[in-house]
Design a protein with these regions (language model features):
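Nucleotide-activated donor-binding/catalytic signature segment of Leloir-type glycosyltransferases, i.e.
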Residues: 243-268
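Conserved donor-binding/catalytic core segment of Leloir-type glycosyltransferases
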Residues: 5, 159, 192-220, 233
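N-terminal subdomain of nucleotide-sugar transferases
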Residues: 1-46, 50-56, 157, 181, ...
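Nucleotide-sugar-dependent
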Residues: 15, 211, 265-270, 277-296, ...
Length: 381
């Protein structure tokens, strides 16, 4: 049994980052370990708090009230490192897990912890592109890139979210790489049988991905040109945004239903009604290194996925087995994929739904990772 200090720029399990570390912590707790969260640079300036959530202790550290100090922290992490040192001295952990460190702190943390007999691991879920379009994004991306290429090999263990990151770390001599995709609280035991008639597809995404959404919308509009054969539920994008993208007024006539932003519970209900969910990613490093929670959630709900191949999380989708995989995500390629779906009978789709749940049970259940995580946090430096 070890005392684990989970450090990162996250909060309670209300965001993707918060949910990720919370799920990992639950697996560690199941193995008998004690997990404490140190949540850095919280948005409430100057305020610090300690709270209990589901039996976990959260230490919340607010940002500095000084903008200059916050900028300085982005470049060198001085303020955060002081907080980290104080917390380590107070809590006396056996091991530390750092979530997506982005302030060039890894070397400092290792140097501080190893002489004290504390092991250091990382939970890595992203690897940004180096884009100069936004200065601060570039600074963060550069820091992350430096850390992954230069510092992570010195860690005692790495928790990787994707096959892409795992392959990178293993090929660069990193020791003890553990691949853990997004963990789901529940995998459906029974599928919803496919209804006869019109097929239902669901897309849940952000308006910022409009360049990926537009070809899909065009494919839906074209395939429903004479009559509605496919209903496309769009979650996360408003009717006005879809109308602007497609330059049409009557979305329902084209089989498109836009929900806008909805609570997660409502989003799940929409996904559960679908025959396939939609996931299109750019063929860029960030997409390969990350792992879409929407993909794991869809499979856990027994819904196969129509996705494009980018060499990331899509590697767990086998074409015709637990989803449909296409090479491009242009409107022509998407339309051909939808036409394939329309040719499938209800029994074939039900089989793919069953395979989706089987994939989820083999990948996204926390207990699958209990022993390997427990070994990592309990090994000696």
């Amino acid at each position: 049994m070890s005392k684990v200090l989970y450090i990162g720029w996250f909060g309670l399990p209300e965001t993707a980052a918060g949910i990720r570390v919370y799920q990992i912590a639950k697996v560690l707790r199941e193995a008998g370990n004690d997990v404490i969260f140190l949540c850095l640079s919280q948005p409430t300036a100057g305020k610090c708090a300690e709270i209990e959530y589901d039996g976990f202790h959260y230490i919340l550290k607010g940002q500095s009230k000084s903008k200059i100090k916050n900028v300085e922290n982005i470049f060198c992490g001085c303020a955060d490192f002081c907080v980290i040192k104080d917390t380590i001295i107070t809590e006396k952990p056996d091991t530390i897990i750092v979530y997506n460190e982005k302030e060039r702190l890894t070397k400092k943390i290792i140097s501080f912890c190893h002489p004290r007999g504390i092991t250091v691991g990382a939970d890595v879920t992203e690897w940004y592109e180096l884009s100069r379009s936004k200065k601060w994004n570039y600074v963060v991306a550069k820091n992350v890139d430096y850390r992954i290429r230069t510092m992570d090999s010195k860690l005692d263990y790495i928790i990787s979210i994707s096959p892409f990151l795992t392959a990178y770390y293993q090929s660069h001599g990193c020791k003890n790489v553990i691949e853990i995709p997004p963990i789901m609280d529940c995998v459906k035991s029974e599928i919803v049988p496919t209804s006869h008639g019109v097929r239902h597809l669901v897309y849940a995404g952000a308006p910022a991905q409009k360049d990926l959404l537009l070809p899909y919308l065009i494919a839906i509009k074209d395939i429903n040109d004479d009559r509605v054969k496919v209903v496309a539920d769009i979650v996360g994008v408003t009717k006005e945004q879809v109308r602007t993208l497609l330059q049409i007024d009557d979305l329902e006539k084209s089989g498109i239903i836009a929900y806008g932003r909805v609570p997660h519970e409502e989003c799940v209900k929409v996904i559960e009604k679908a025959d396939f969910s939609i996931l299109f990613r750019e063929n860029l490093r960030y997409a390969k290194a990350g792992f879409s929670t929407k993909l794991s959630e869809s499979l856990s709900l027994g819904i196969p996925v129509l996705c494009n191949a980018v060499g990331g999380a899509d590697e767990i989708i086998t074409d015709g087995f637990n989803g449909i995989k296409i090479e491009g995500c242009d409107s022509v390629s998407i339309m051909k994929a939808i036409e394939r779906i329309l040719l499938l009978d209800e029994g074939s789709i039900d089989a793919m739904k069953q395979h989706a749940t089987e994939t989820a049970k083999q990948r996204f259940v926390g207990e699958l990772y209990t022993s390997v995580l427990d070994r990592a946090v309990n090994m000696k430096p």
